[in-house]
Amino acid sequence: MQTTQMEYHNPVLLMPTVDGLAIKPDGVYVDVTFGGGGHAREILKRLGPKGKLIAFDQDKDALENTIDDSRFVLVNENFRFLKRFLRFHGHKEVDGILGDFGVSSHQFDVAERGFSTRFEAELDMRMDQGSAFSAYDVVNNYDESQLASVLFQYGELRASKAMARVICEAREKEPIKTSEQLKETMGRFLPKHREHKILAQIYQAIRIEVNQELEVIKEFLQQALEVLKPDGRLSLISYHSLEDRLVKRFMRNGMFEGEPEKDMFGRVEVPMKPVGKFIIPDAAEIKENNRARSAKLRVAKKL
């Protein structure tokens, strides 16, 4: 098994995430967020000669991290197309699915991708670099109410309406093209002691909108339930409350909102069952990789 790897961080919660799949040597597994390939390589170590791993990543940079292994296939597509491409590769059912929903360190550390608040860069934030829609479009083309909604729903920012108004006023004078311009525009909302946190929330909101992250996760989860075999495992890492809420609810009752209907005897049939409690990184892992600090792993199996 040969690899060619770009600079990516060590995979978060590597062992517990792969352990959560309860891998069968001859099973078929999916890594829907290939990235640097860390989780994928650990899965391949545990598979036998007849096992199979299909990985997804829409970021063309991830293709540089190729794994030369006959048991491995890398699909350069968004995992919202999970079912379609599994069928294309001859698989209607799989034994387990792994996903790490975080933005990779590589994406954060390449300044021109525009994901990080640390760098001066054009407003971009596209995970799929082939997409025509970027952070520039959200910041400069959304009306005030749309902007306020994005900042409130996805950034959980209390001052979302005021922020949206200030952005709209600023862009009337000139387009907001760069991260530095956006930061200057938001200056009054960034007190020194909370500047980085609030700016990160603003970036998170815009990034989620650009990439339709929550809608993609919903589509993926519904398809995952369809393609998992009975007792098949779902092992997922989320990084903020919006993602985790979707994952938690879906693993508990197969729904994103509301409660499942009861039958005439008051019983509820649910399609999945959580396996154990959620897992977070220990102090040693957080010290080694600070971006792991907000990670939360949940595992479930299909009933």
Language-model region placement:
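S-adenosyl-L-methionine-dependent methyltransferase catalytic core, i.e., the SAM/SAH-binding region
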Residues: M1-L303
